[in-house]
Amino acid sequence: MAMRIRLSFERPEGSGLCIMVDLLRASATITAALDRFREVIPVADIEEAMEYSRKGYLVAGERGGETLPGFIANSPLEVKNYRGDVLVLTTSNGTRILESVKSDALVGCLNNLDAVAEAARELSDEVEVVMAGVNGRFAIEDFLCAGEIIAAIDGEMDEYAEASVLAVQDRSLVDDAIRRSRSAERLGGLGFMDDVEYCIKRNITGNVPVYRDGRIELMEEIRRLH
């Protein structure tokens, strides 16, 4: 049976395996963090994140791209400077999307492009890529990242998914569009342009983060335990 792939915005609309895409920067931060931490706990609420911090957990968090006081940045480059058992993460968009997912979900970005596509093919014949967007608005960087993931999975696509694949035929244009996106411009203004360049890198890791029961672990770790 051919893979069936659909693309949606902010929340899953079907019952297939979800891949959450928040290119700038939650997806990349989570993927990088799992090199240094056993698991990531995503929380949507700042107060809940602060409670974790008071209990001694390391917390990464931002709103509107700005790092929250007392937390480390939602940055794939910054999390590489830390190591531990658990990282708590709260972000403007990606963590909120994960909390709305009712079943298991993968976390996808360009850094783990082929790895997450291969995992999706292995786990299900029905996949839904969910774009996080920015505060309820369409984000071109998520659309383009989704297109590359969907192209790598390769299957029967709904029209939205097909449009995203058609949009990523020229990789140099994709990269330019991501760099010129509202999100990238804001991050650049806050001093995080290195993060943007990092998030554009493709296939630099085989990490496949899996969100399950409120926590994110590597797929290989879940396999080992189950």
Curated annotation (Swiss-Prot):
Main enzyme class: hydrolase
Sample GO molecular function, one term: 2-phosphosulfolactate phosphatase activity
GO biological process, one term: coenzyme M biosynthetic process
Enzyme Commission identifier(s): 3.1.3.71
Pfam families cross-referenced by the UniProt entry: 2-ph_phosp (PF04029)
Cofactor(s) of this protein: Mg(2+)
Magnesium keyword on record: yes
Listed HAMAP family: ComB (MF_00490)
NCBIfam families (UniProt xref): 2-phosphosulfolactate phosphatase
Listed name of the protein: 2-phosphosulfolactate phosphatase
